[in-house]
A protein has these predicted regions:
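N-terminal glycine-/serine-/threonine-rich beta1-alpha1-beta2 phosphate-ribose binding loop
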Residues: 1-98
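Catalytic, metal-anchored helix/loop core of enzyme active sites in primary metabolism
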Residues: 153-157, 165-168, 172, 184, ...
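General beta-strand structural signal in soluble alpha/beta enzymes
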Residues: 62-64, 79-80, 103-105, 128-132, ...
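Substrate-binding/catalytic subdomain of NAD(P)-dependent oxidoreductase enzymes
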Residues: 180-278, 283-285
Length: 431
């Protein structure tokens, strides 16, 4: 190692890779003053050199050969921004085993194989950092691992997908229906050409797996997280929620309960007074609860070229400081517990239910009898003025109930002739 320069390699030169390169170049002098060392990008791994060359002044940095990076002893830090599982996993593992430090923003990989990568880093006494894998520019992984380490964390939840938050904001503030808000999000570049991972909650689910693992010191994999998207939410649901003093947000939730971890992503009604209800457009926020700190919230841009690059470069700085201090590998995998993850049917929530029933006497009594049969306590029943073709629209809010019991009650309701349609079921956050 040159005492004034630490050399790094970028894997991938897309939106985030370009942002990281810009930040390191534009802030070169100030960063050198901050950490007492210059960080220099020596190589950038790309698939198409000709295409990438249009985005950089010095095309000699570009390579399509991984061997040029893994076999270069001068390269001490590998910054993986390729995305996906393979070949990213192969490259990261080989870099760690070769004694190189790694920074990654790859939530898809970390949500499934993060523990294997952290174990490999521990064995080689190097750092593997991934702040940018969750909520882009918002610092949350480092605070959970360091600043909040003295807490017993019982809950971490938040808005961790900017696309769906933008869509729900437009539906709430402008009365748009889902398909129109999605079209606008696509037009403005917030949604991908294939928005499935966002609108079905898969992107948020990966982030919840990572947050739960770090918060509760126990391994939670992506497959452990229940996911449900926002495609069925209507402007009518949002209107009714507003009448009740609530907003609808796609929330990622992880709770550390006495009988196991609850981890899920779904639309939820939250009180309009809750801090998360004020998080709009493409912004993200993560809300945590610990026994000592009590409630804390982290807010900011959850995606984008420079916000994500900010988190990546922050990890690079941490590694450089560790290298200079000779204390690499200080904080590896913190999942020293083995807490079971509960199945969704064993979780407990309140529910918002909107349905159409026959407009006649006795129907509401039939409904409440079915709910009572399955230990579903009803907090509120509201019959709306809307009446179409002999049907009345009814909104039900339940007390907290085991999801499996609630589902069974719903199936019996579906089979009743008096229940014409169950339009919406949304979980309700809070007591």
């Amino acid at each position: 190692m040159n005492e004034n320069v630490i050399k790094a390699a970028l894997l991938g030169f897309g939106t985030v890779g370009t942002g990281v390169y810009k930040v390191l170049k534009n802030q070169e002098k100030e960063m050198s003053a901050k950490i007492g060392c210059k960080v220099e990008i020596k190589k950038i791994l790309v698939r198409n050199i000709e295409k990438a060359a249009a985005k950089i002044e010095d095309a000699s940095l570009l390579t399509s050969q991984w061997d040029e990076i893994i076999n270069d002893p001068e390269i001490e830090i590998v910054i993986e921004l390729m995305g996906g599982i393979n070949p990213a996993k192969e490259y990261i593992l080989s870099a760690l085993k070769a004694g190189k430090h790694v920074v990654s923003a790859n939530k898809d990989l970390i949500a499934v194989h993060g523990h294997e990568l952290l174990d490999a880093a521990h064995e080689s006494k190097v750092d593997f950092l991934f702040e940018a894998a969750v909520a882009g520019g918002i610092p949350i992984i480092r605070p959970l691992k360091q600043c909040l380490a003295g807490n017993h964390m019982t809950e971490v939840m938040g808005i961790v997908n900017g696309t769906t938050n933008f869509i729900l904001t437009k539906m709430t503030q402008e009365g748009m229906e889902f398909k129109d808000a999605l079209a606008l999000a696509t037009e403005l570049g917030y949604a991908e050409a294939d928005p499935t991972a966002d609108i079905e909650g898969l992107d948020a689910g990966r982030k919840v797996a990572i947050l739960a693992s770090v918060s509760f010191n126990s391994r939670v994999l992506f497959n452990d997280v229940y996911t449900e998207g926002i495609a069925k939410i209507t402007s009518k649901d949002i209107h009714y929620a507003k009448e009740m003093g609530r907003d609808i947000k796609l929330l990622g939730v992880a709770r550390n309960e006495a009988d196991g971890i609850e981890a899920y992503v779904c639309p939820m009604l939250i009180p309009s007074s809750h801090p998360l209800a004020t998080v709009n457009d493409s912004y993200n926020a993560v809300f945590v609860h610990g026994d000592a700190v009590e409630d804390a919230m982290f807010f900011g841009r959850g995606a984008g070229e420079l916000p994500t690059a900010s988190a990546v470069v922050g990890d690079v700085f941490d590694i450089v400081r560790n290298i200079l201090a000779g204390c690499c590998g200080r904080i590896g995998c913190t999942c020293y517990k083995n807490i079971p993850v509960k199945k969704m049917e064993d979780t407990h929530n309140r529910y918002f239910l909107r349905l159409k029933v026959e407009d006649r006497c006795g129907v509401l009594a039939e409904m409440t009898a079915i709910f009572a049969k399955y230990q579903v306590s009803v907090a509120q029943i509201i019959q709306k003025d809307t009446k179409v073709e002999g049907c009345a629209e009814v909104v039900v809010i339940t007390e907290k109930v085991r999801e499996g019991d609630f589902r069974t009650a719903i199936e019996e309701l579906r089979n009743r002739d008096s229940v014409r349609k169950i339009s919406t079921i949304i979980r309700v956050y809070g007591k």
